[in-house]
């Protein structure tokens, strides 16, 4: 189904579409999902949708809903009782698009998070079968916490590498400043000026990256703490009879 719809969407959007991707639970093996496929279409500019919207409005299978709160245009295919696709049209440079792709990739590559998300969806489906607002709110809390946690963790590593390199640069510059003997006055002064700049800029970068690392660690710590609280609550709920799998 996805491959067929993908081909049709490329025909509809043409060069306005930069990327079309399968997202949502149906894109992840092992996750419970409704038989509705979520697709995201990334445009260079969301306003470009106006150039192709007539192709959807002229087809009775499609209906359009502009969701400016989420920076997207939602195109639904199929009727209320026979919904087939949710097509999320977004600006490729928007935070919303980056978050959607990042969360999908996290579920694809992080088995523990994928399993925790599966348990959450199972509980919410049973707990709020007719309350879409509550279901979405609880799921959004998990997604936002996961994004914050994983982003901070993956960013912290490169920041620490930069801190290490800048520290080594400062040490080498400091050593050159005071330890390298030069007989010619010109070369001595040149090395002194270069080493002074190396010490200064290396030190500034080191202190900046250390400060950024502390902020990232604190952000990761808080997100991880909240994530564990959500997971612990889920595990407790799963022991109850009405929520058991």
What does each model-identified segment do?
Residues 1-21, 144:
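Helical scaffold of the NTase/Pol beta-like nucleotidyltransferase catalytic core
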Residues 61-95:
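Conserved catalytic core of two-metal-ion nucleotidyltransferases
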Residues 95-151:
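Catalytic cores of NTP-dependent nucleotidyl/adenyl transfer enzymes across multiple folds
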Residues 148, 152-170, 175:
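Juxtamembrane interface helix immediately N-terminal to a transmembrane segment
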Residues 167, 192-216:
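Canonical hydrophobic alpha-helical transmembrane segment
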Residues 176-199:
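Interfacial non-cytosolic loop connecting adjacent transmembrane helices
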């Amino acid at each position: 189904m996805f491959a067929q719809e993908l081909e049709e969407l490329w025909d509809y959007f043409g060069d306005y579409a930069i990327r079309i991707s399968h997202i949502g639970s149906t894109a992840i093996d092992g996750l419970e999902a409704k038989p509705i496929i979520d697709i995201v279409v990334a445009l260079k500019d969301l306003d470009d949708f106006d150039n192709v919207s007539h192709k959807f409005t002229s087809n009775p299978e499609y209906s359009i809903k502009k969701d400016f709160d989420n920076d997207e245009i939602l195109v639904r295919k199929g009727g209320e009782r026979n919904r087939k696709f949710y097509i999320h049209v977004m600006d490729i440079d928007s935070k919303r698009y980056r978050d959607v792709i990042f969360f999908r990739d996290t579920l694809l590559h992080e088995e523990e998070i994928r399993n925790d998300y599966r348990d959450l969806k199972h509980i919410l489906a049973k707990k709020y079968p007719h309350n879409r607002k509550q279901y979405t709110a609880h799921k959004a809390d998990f997604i936002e916490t996961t994004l914050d946690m994983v982003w901070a963790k993956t960013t912290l590593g490169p920041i620490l590498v930069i801190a290490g390199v800048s520290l080594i640069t400062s040490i080498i510059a400091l050593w050159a400043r005071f330890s390298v003997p030069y007989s010619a006055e010109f070369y001595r002064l040149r090395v002194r000026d270069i080493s002074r700049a190396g010490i200064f800029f290396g030190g500034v970068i080191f202190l900046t990256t250390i400060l950024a690392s502390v902020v990232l660690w604190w952000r990761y710590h808080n997100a991880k703490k909240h994530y564990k609280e959500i997971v612990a609550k889920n595990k407790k709920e799963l022991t109850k009879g009405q929520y058991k799998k």
